[in-house]
């Protein structure tokens, strides 16, 4: 069935007059047709470097990934922001499920597409992942040698969260078994009911009289206000399928991250609750040993603010930034450093 693509500009960010934009589609190796926004710098000539962008987890290309893609197109790159399989305007049934394997393939399919564009230099392709898709991007970098530079912004390691909970607070055999029982009971109910239950997105209204962690308030401020709300975003609406991430509970991310030879930059906010996931991924990838450990809960704060380099790998901790600041805050996202890192390594 043909994808239904909107013709209107329905992004949560203004349209740039410095780039050309159009909708494109392409298929991954699982036969799922993906929808993407293609951004090209105006009046450019010759073969250009290119970037594929996706994320955050539960978002659509009209949100943060499109914001990044348009910004990088203004800087001279051909870019696409794509909806992963089963989400947004992309194909795939059932809806609102995730698969580590299929989502890595989504990135590879985006590289396939870019490699075959007349105005793209296939030897100068990079990828950017945001939030949960930063983790997918890093995993893709382990398998796809065509990717010359990978940018992981405000990373979530989704399999780790699904398996061990936040800050590994559920990292026990007993806790994992409880979650497995719950998700498999939900599968039974889904089959009986003929549809997959959705677990709910970010609450529409913040509860009164309840002191929520700052990161939950930040998610609400992005997904449920005009700043970032989008009608096709699962986070802005009814969320992921409750049993749709079963396979993530049986997956260990970044098993071969130490074998990545091409360049990787991991960017994270100093104040982000999720910071430990980027710090740990950088250590797994490079073997880096942190000199400090002032982590309160129990991880955040191992790496110094600023740049940590190991060859062509970099961890950049952005001073004062939260997790969601790196979704769309142009004065906080280090676009100049991202651009310089990519151009240095392609």
Model-predicted segments: where are they?
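N-terminal cap/lid segment of alpha/beta-hydrolase-fold proteins
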Residues: 3-46, 327
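Short beta-strand element of the alpha/beta-hydrolase
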Residues: 47-56
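The serine-hydrolase catalytic nucleophile loop
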Residues: 58-70, 84
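Catalytic nucleophile-loop/oxyanion-hole region of alpha/beta-hydrolase
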Residues: 61, 87-122, 328-334
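Conserved alpha/beta-hydrolase
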Residues: 71-91
């Amino acid at each position: 069935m043909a994808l239904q693509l909107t013709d209107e500009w329905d992004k949560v960010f203004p349209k740039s007059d410095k780039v050309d934009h159009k909708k494109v589609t392409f298929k991954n190796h699982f036969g799922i047709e993906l929808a993407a926004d293609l951004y090209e710098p105006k009046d450019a000539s010759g073969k250009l470097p290119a970037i594929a962008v996706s994320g955050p987890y539960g978002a659509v290309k009209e949100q943060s990934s499109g914001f990044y893609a348009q910004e990088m197109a203004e800087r001279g790159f051909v870019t696409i922001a794509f909806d992963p399989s089963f989400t947004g305007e992309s194909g795939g049934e059932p809806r609102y499920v995730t698969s580590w394997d299929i989502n890595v393939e989504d990135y590879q399919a985006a590289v396939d597409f870019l490699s075959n564009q007349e105005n793209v230099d296939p030897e100068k392709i990079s990828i950017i992942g945001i939030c949960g898709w930063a983790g997918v991007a890093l995993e893709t970098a382990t398998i796809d040698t065509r990717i010359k530079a990978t940018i992981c912004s405000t990373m979530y390691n989704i399999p780790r969260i699904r398996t061990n909970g936040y800050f590994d607070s559920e990292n026990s055999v007993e806790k994992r078994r409880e979650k497995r029982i719950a998700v498999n009971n939900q599968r039974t109910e889904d089959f009986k009911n003929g549809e997959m239950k959705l677990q709910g997105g970010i609450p529409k209204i913040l509860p009164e009289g309840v002191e929520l962690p700052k990161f939950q308030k930040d998610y609400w401020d992005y997904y449920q206000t005009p700043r970032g709300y989008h009608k096709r975003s699962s986070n802005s609406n009814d969320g992921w399928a409750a049993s749709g991430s079963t396979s993530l509970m049986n997956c260990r991310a970044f098993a071969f991250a130490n074998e990545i030879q091409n360049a990787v930059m991991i960017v994270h906010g100093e104040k982000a609750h999720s910071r430990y996931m980027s710090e740990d991924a950088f250590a797994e990838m490079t073997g880096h040993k942190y000199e400090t450990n002032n982590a309160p809960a129990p991880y955040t704060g191992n790496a110094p603010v600023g740049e940590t380099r190991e060859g062509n790998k970099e961890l950049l901790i952005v001073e004062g930034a939260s997790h969601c600041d790196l979704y769309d805050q142009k004065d906080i996202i280090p676009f100049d450093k991202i651009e310089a890192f990519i151009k240095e390594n392609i």
